[in-house]
Amino acid sequence: MTQKNKQYKLEKGLMLFTQPRSPYFYGKIRFNKKYLTKSFAPIVSRADAELELYAWRDSLFKNDTPSAKTISEETGARSQYIEHEEIINDFQFLEVGRFDPQKKSLEERKISFVEIYGEYNQTEVSNQAHRCLDCGNPYCEWKCPVHNYIPDWLKLVNEGNIIEAAELCHQTNSLPEMCGRVCPQDRLCEGACTLNDGFGAVTIGSTEKYITDKAFEMGWKPDMSYRTWTDKKVAIVGAGPAGIACADVLTRSGVKSHVYDKYQEIGGLLTFGIPEFKLEKKVVKKRRDILEGMGVEFFLGKEIGKDIQFKELYENYDAVFLGMGTYTSLEGGFKGEKLPNVFKALDYLISSTNRLLKIEKDKEKFINLKGKNVIVLGGGDTAMDCNRTAVRQGAKSVKCLYRRDEKNMPGSKREVTNAKEEGVEFEFNIQPIEIIGKEKVEGIKVVRTELGDADQNGRRVPIPIPGSELIIEADAVIIAFGFRASPSDWFKDFNINTQNNGLVLAAEEQKYKFQTSNNKIFSGGDMVRGSDLVVTAIWEGREAAKSIIEYVS
């Protein structure tokens, strides 16, 4: 058995043994308040699991394992060894299945821009947290981009220690309440959960949301009593996840953080790109209150290069962090994209958010798809956001066209399921050729596809099937093909190098992580790695902040 499949952990003379990815049973034996743990191969009944556990215990008694030998030598006689023995079986995952917070009714979901998931109560969240096996090698932590201490805060919330759990969440994550809502847990932490196959993963995301929401309700705020302000200050351009995370770490370390953003609210795409039925904006507002209470200063409605020149920041701060994201929409390159009622995904989502927040500058620019037959092109989470927003606006019909099959959709399975429930129709293996219309959209010409060999990214390439063309009627088309970088004009003036695709060059593997070609300037998030998850932007913002602290010191 390789080291990858088998792990030993030495702790106070006690050998703990785990065999990861044995998803059906996990046992503990405690000797003199010390734990010996083991996970077993597939077992489907409690009786079988108990037999395995006691057989394992008996083998330890015979001193035929290194673990038993270590314990016996430390505790002395076997009588003492047995006297202090306590058997603890973790059968919670057998007795209590996965239980997600209840969704609002479909009738309510289709007409309201509020989060669709309800809340756990303390009993429910405790039961779900107790399902965690506390694996010796927690795959959930490794799969999480910020490497949250997931088993540890699950244990705390199971015990009712909400404030302690919130403190632990914030040790690795600057925005846990948002990650609990918008992370695709099904392909990250929960997808890696040992219980995922057969029993249903622990509800990590919903529990993370509960912890932070409940802690805020209880009055939790970061303890800044230990902090001493330094004479250093850093300018952060962009109040999205990367910028916020950078400011959080810097401020906790006594480095003053001034955050500039062109929008009137913080959050970046958290606020303007993610609809309220996934993330209510009061959640972002609460985080802003927390950050300002910590000492972070925001300068909003200020576009760098237009309202404020970058030179001013460069000369007046000890370092600068760029976290401006990627806001330029990718185009399909086919005829008809410029027709009226063809919209870019982000323009559509921002229009909707501005109306809901009552901050739109020009009411005539509001995009209202009520009563229209809407087609959304794309298969990612942004496409799902557009689909579900159109439903809530009262569109007559909403169809989502994707050029691969459902299995190869890049979006979260949870979001696809929610869209289907709300009435969105999906057409797979269909590729757009041309948007049809004269003075406005009348339909879209498409061709059916089949999947060929995998490309360099491991995804199978869609191949058009000759003679399979058809036209689908539509009144409006939303293009959700993703985003690309849009380097600012002033990058060259300050020696900020980019790749050919416009992404800023700021490698993680160097002395100062995420430092650009200009030593004083750091960058992270989507403008470095391309459009990605909120949680990866948080990770890079935090890591860049650590490098900045070292740099300015």
Model-derived features with residue positions:
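Basic/aromatic DNA-contact patch characteristic of tyrosine site-specific recombinases
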Residues: 1-75, 80
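Beta1-alpha1 glycine-rich phosphate/pyrophosphate-binding loop at the start
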Residues: 86-87, 91-118, 147-159, 169-170, ...
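FAD-site-proximal beta/loop scaffold in flavoenzymes
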Residues: 88, 338-371, 454-531
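Ferredoxin-type iron-sulfur electron-transfer modules in oxidoreductases and energy-metabolism complexes
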Residues: 109-129, 149-181, 198-227, 352-353
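Short cysteine clusters
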Residues: 132-135, 140, 144, 179, ...
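Feature captures the FAD/FMN-dependent oxidoreductase FAD-binding
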Residues: 164, 228, 233-237, 285-334, ...
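Glycine-rich dinucleotide-binding loop and its adjacent helix/turn
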Residues: 207, 211-228, 286-306, 329-393, ...
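A conserved FAD-binding loop/helix module that cradles the flavin
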Residues: 386, 527-552
